[in-house]
Curated annotation (Swiss-Prot):
Organism: Coffea arabica
Origin organism lineage: Eukaryota, Viridiplantae, Streptophyta, Embryophyta, Tracheophyta
Disulfide bonds: none
Protein role: Binds to 23S rRNA.
Gene behind the chain: rpl14
Protein name: Large ribosomal subunit protein uL14c
PANTHER family (alphabetical): 50S/60S RIBOSOMAL PROTEIN L14/L23 (PTHR11761), LARGE RIBOSOMAL SUBUNIT PROTEIN UL14M (PTHR11761:SF3)
Principal subcellular localisation of the protein: plastid
Length: 122
């Protein structure tokens, strides 16, 4: 469950290290975002000499949350951190590598490029 002011780790090599959610894309009054939702975020911490800089506003898709994700078959998945991948306007990742495991639900939400770059899909 990601809401505005939540800090997230960045799970790619785009140059950002930490994001802060400022808006959830979708319905105008959505309170929480879950895995697969697109958010608007500001970069709070960045790697020096990279294209993305601190205080830059970006779009990101959530790939891991500490809140449990319950699947239709009864399986419950919970991650150790909240993480997102920085994307462009078309939904393609800005980085070329993805770090850590991501959820299978991203494939159904047409984030196939992120799924193909991920080392592990749960």
């Amino acid at each position: 469950m990601i809401q505005p002011q939540t800090h997230l780790n960045v799970a790619d090599n785009s140059g950002a290290r930490e994001l802060m959610c400022i808006r959830i894309i979708g319905a105008s009054n959505r309170r929480y975002a879950h895995i697969g939702d697109v958010i608007v975020a500001v970069i709070k911490e960045a790697v020096p000499n990279m294209p993305l800089e601190r205080s830059e506003v970006v779009r990101a898709v959530i790939v891991r949350t500490c809140k449990e994700l319950k699947r239709d078959n009864g399986m419950i998945i919970r991650y150790d951190d909240n993480a997102a991948v920085v994307i462009d306007q078309e939904g393609n990742p800005k980085g070329t590598r993805i770090f850590g495991a991501i959820a299978r639900e991203l494939r159904q939400l047409n984030f196939t490029k992120i799924v193909s770059l991920a080392p592990e899909v749960l």
